[in-house]
Structure formats: structure tokens, C-alpha cells
Amino acid sequence: MARAVRNIGRAGVAATALSAVDTAMWDVKARLLGCPLAGLLGRWREAVPVYGSGGFTSYHERQLGRQLADWVGRDEIPRVKIKIGEDWGGNERRDLDRVAQARQVIGPDAELFVDANGAYRTGQAVRVAARLAEHGVTWFEEPVSSQDLAGLAAVRAQVRPDVAAGEYSWSLADSARLIAAGAVDCLQLDVTRCGGITGFLAASALAVGASLGVSAHCAPNLHAQVGVGVPNLRHIEYFHDHQRIERMFSDGVMDPGGGMLRPDPGRHWLGMELRAADAEPFRRA
């Protein structure tokens, strides 16, 4: 499949299409064997850790506080992530005010992660990271562009929080470059982008060789099925929008209570079934 899209380019839309086909083939294999995907891949664990992810810069204070309080209080998820890097790094003061608010809401014990979506310059990211550490931030995602491998490595060498990137890796080669550059403390991967389940497993194996953990980007219910079979998985992103869509249209969605997703060994294949009638009103083609 990768050779077939060489002339139009492997990254972007082509990669997501390849990833979808690969994932579907794994689903077919599990169906033919009559077993859950998690069992087919081999279970290293019965459940996978998740972190609540949302906290968009467009949220007002009350909205941010309510979302964080629900994750930590209602769902008992012990780790959460918010967005920073508003206006492409042009509003550091509000970024830091929101981090301070988040820490106040979740209390001293929950882990606090931030994602700048590549908004900062290298020196700026180092400066911001020093302030983040004051609030106990332990995860700094894409402090600079994920294409700036030298910049990521420079930030990583100078800051206390773990530096993470990789959600835009479209191939095994992309992940290999991040690892070789010493750009990350934790490699992010996305089954829907990196070549499907096959690509995710291959990149995870590369990370094992570099003594790195991996973290799954979005699509939490899909990644949970894969994640139980990945020995170096650190956690899965329980992303606000994705989990909402999964609940709207699918049966078999897992509950994140206690900060863990637990694939049901009694549910075969990918574990979810599309409710086609619920999705039909949103059809556009």
C-alpha cells in the first residue's frame, strides 16, 4: 500500500487512508479467529492508563475548571492535560495563568500535562518550562514544532518536564528520526496516522530499543485495544472530542473511571460496534 501512494506522497490524507485499511485488516483477522483484538496482539496488562485531555485555550475559566474537576473528581482520572501556546506563543501570561488555575482545581496530587502544539520558539519554550515546573507540570508536549528536531532536543536538554512529540509521525521513518535526534522523552503515536496497528507496533518496538515509552494520541477506545499489548505504553490520551464521538455512535465504549480503560475480553474484534442509525443523520456523501 505504501508503494502505491509514493507519487502522491505518503504523509497526510494518504497515511490516514493506509492506517484505516491496516486497522480494518486487523479487525478482519480478529473476526475470523473469533477473538478480541487485545487477545490477538497479546496482553501485557488488563487495563491501560489514560489522561483527560482538552482544556482548550478557547475555554473561559469556568469551563476549564468544570472540565478538569469532572475528570479528577467525578471520573477519578489522576492525570489531565490542557492546551497552552495561545496566539502561537503570543500570550504567555494567560498560558501561565491557566496552568496555575488548573493546578488549583485538580489539587497537588493529580499529574498536570500541557500541550503547546508547537507554538513556542526554542528559547521561549525553555523559559516557559521553568515556570511550568513551579506548578508541578511533568509533561510538555510539542513545546516547539514537531518538525524542528534540533529545537525539540535543545528544549529537552534544558527543562524538567518530559518532552513529548510524535502525533504527526506518518511513517516508521518519522518516528525513527525523532528517536535518533534525541528529541523526546516519550514518543507519541497515533494508530489512525502512523500506518495503522502494524505501524504502531513497529514504532513502539523502535522506542523499546531506545529505552523510551510511548503514548497513544486520541482515539482512546481503539488505542486501548492495542495498548494492552504494548509493553512500553505509558498512557493513552482520553481526548474530549474523540470520546464524545465514540459515545455518540458506538456500542462497547469503555469507561475511564479510575484513570484506566479496561478492554472487555468478552467483546470480540475491535470491541466497538457502529450504531449506523445514529450516524446516518450526519452523512455527507
Predicted regions and their residues:
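N-terminal capping/lid subdomain adjacent to the active-site entrance of alpha/beta enzymes
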Residues: M1-L112, N117-A119, V126, A130-E134, ...
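Flexible, glycine/charged-enriched surface loops at secondary-structure junctions
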Residues: L37-L40, W139-P143, H217
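Short, surface-exposed acidic/glycine-rich loop or hinge patches that mediate macromolecular interfaces
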Residues: G55-S58, A119, S145, Y168-S169, ...
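Short, active-site-adjacent cap segments at secondary-structure transitions
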Residues: Y120-R121, H223
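Conserved protein kinase catalytic core
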Residues: D87-G89, R121, Q147-D148, G196
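Hydrophobic faces of well-ordered beta-strands that scaffold small-molecule active sites
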Residues: V50-G54, P78-I82, A110-A116, F140-E141, ...
